[in-house]
């Protein structure tokens, strides 16, 4: 079955389902799905999640049962107090001892840099994670370089996770549902990097009612709109963010200055749709687009430079419950990152382009043969298009362009299988 938030329809990641008479339980996965095999009989079921009312139901098991549970937030008149604990042996016996799950709501309560809640700045507070210096792009995990971290947004690789030369991350906290960082002992489903995995998932959107959220910071503002497509079946979320550094710079550079028109700003946009086709099938479509724009003008010498760069990702995902013990997820993934340098003086124009584009597909299965085993297996394929350097230049009527001749094409494939066994 699945576990949902009763007010928003969001799937609940990590909801705990426990049968006291059998002292057995299960935790919902990243799609809110759970599966457990039990002997025939009648049992009490307890479903709990921090900040939500615990659900207790009497369940009769005389055949395969599929249920959907909706959890209501717990109302309280006083300030929230959350007490959490972990089994003292979890750090040494758990197969996920290198995984840290970050609470997005907790991140929003931390001091924000220039009014912006930042995922990358938050994870740098964790042990084993650091930044080389203030303003540096990326993060370092246990001595590994920034290029040794696999950063995923809804399964799509993000090659440059920073704005403003490292001061901000590309992740808008208003559009994020969960953040996991794996610093060691990476599961078999992830590959291609040595140091860590940063897995970020976007909100699915509220399938009960329209909601609008926004914020104004010192350097940027943001706006998020979410709501149902069809109530209880589908929802959407769109979120945008933009700096107004260009407006501030314009106020400090007068029109008569030789450097009038010099500017910098960044913007990004997140969107996600999901729809429940049947009780066993659900589709998701999510995307991200972000861009930094820097330009420098020297009007006296008729000289100008501009440097745009940014990421774009897209993920189309299909979830299917094949049977009570087997869950499938199929994804089609698009990723693009590019950097461009453009310069001109009088009639001469010069442009340099560099980038990487990926087209990929992935299939994942999760099999629950019994309550002590969780078997995951699947495969993926990625078609890479690398553009190390593409140059174009124009002087009056003379044009030079390398075009696609500098492109490098690559194919990457992988299969995996893993079994998480609870002794």
Region roles according to the model:
Residues 150, 178-189, 195-203, 210-276, ...:
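Predominantly transmembrane beta-strands of Gram-negative outer membrane beta-barrel pores used
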Residues 68, 80, 120, 138, ...:
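Membrane-embedded beta-strand positions in outer-membrane beta-barrel channels/transporters
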Residues 88, 146, 158, 203, ...:
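Structural signature of outer-membrane beta-barrel domains
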Residues 6, 109-110, 166, 210-212, ...:
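Outer-membrane beta-barrel domain signature
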Residues 1-80, 84-86:
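Periplasm-facing N-terminal accessory domains of Gram-negative outer-membrane beta-barrel systems
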Residues 53, 82-186, 197, 203-204:
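Periplasmic N-terminal accessory/gating domains of Gram-negative outer-membrane beta-barrel systems
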Residues 115-117, 192-194, 217-221, 265-267, ...:
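Residues that define the transmembrane beta-barrel architecture of outer-membrane proteins
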Residues 274-292, 308-423:
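Face-selective signature of the C-terminal outer-membrane beta-barrel domain
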């Amino acid at each position: 079955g699945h576990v949902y938030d009763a007010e928003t329809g969001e799937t609940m990641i990590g909801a705990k389902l426990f049968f006291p008479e059998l002292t057995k339980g299960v935790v919902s996965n990243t799609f809110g799905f759970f599966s457990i095999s039990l002997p025939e009989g009648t049992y009490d079921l307890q479903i709990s999640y921090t900040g939500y009312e615990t659900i207790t139901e009497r369940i009769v098991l005389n055949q395969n049962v599929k249920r959907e549970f909706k959890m209501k937030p717990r109302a309280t008149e006083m300030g929230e107090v959350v007490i959490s604990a972990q089994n003292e042996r979890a750090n040494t016996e758990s197969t996920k001892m290198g995984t840290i799950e970050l609470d997005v709501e907790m991140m929003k309560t931390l001091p924000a840099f220039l009014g912006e809640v930042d995922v990358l700045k938050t994870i740098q507070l964790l042990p084993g994670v650091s930044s080389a210096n203030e303003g540096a792009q990326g993060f370092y995990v246990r001595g590994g370089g920034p290029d040794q971290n696999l950063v995923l947004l809804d399964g799509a690789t993000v090659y440059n996770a920073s704005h403003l030369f490292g001061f901000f991350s590309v992740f808008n906290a208003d559009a994020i549902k969960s953040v996991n960082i794996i610093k060691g002992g990476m599961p078999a489903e992830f590959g291609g990097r040595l140091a860590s995995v940063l897995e970020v998932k976007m909100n699915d959107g509220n399938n009960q009612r329209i909601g609008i959220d926004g914020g104004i910071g010192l350097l940027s503002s943001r706006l998020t709109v979410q709501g149902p497509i069809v109530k209880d079946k589908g929802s959407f979320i769109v979120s945008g963010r933009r700096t107004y550094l260009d407006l501030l710079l314009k106020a400090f550079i007068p029109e008569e200055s030789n450097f009038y028109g010099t500017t910098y700003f960044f913007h990004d946009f997140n969107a996600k749709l999901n729809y429940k086709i049947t009780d066993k099938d659900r589709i998701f479509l999510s995307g991200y687009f972000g861009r930094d724009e820097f330009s420098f003008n020297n009007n006296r010498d008729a000289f100008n430079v501009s440097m745009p760069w940014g990421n774009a990702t897209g993920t189309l995902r299909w979830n299917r419950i094949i049977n009570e013990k087997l869950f499938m997820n199929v994804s089609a993934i698009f990723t693009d990152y590019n950097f461009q340098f453009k310069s001109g003086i009088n009639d001469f124009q010069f442009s340099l382009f560099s980038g990487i584009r990926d087209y990929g597909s992935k299939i994942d299965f999760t099999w629950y043969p019994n309550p002590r085993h969780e078997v995951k297996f699947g495969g993926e394929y990625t078609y890479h298009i690398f553009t190390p350097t593409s140059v174009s230049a124009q002087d009056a009527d003379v044009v030079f362009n390398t075009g696609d001749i500098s492109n490098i094409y690559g194919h990457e494939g992988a299969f995996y299988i893993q079994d998480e066994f609870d002794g």
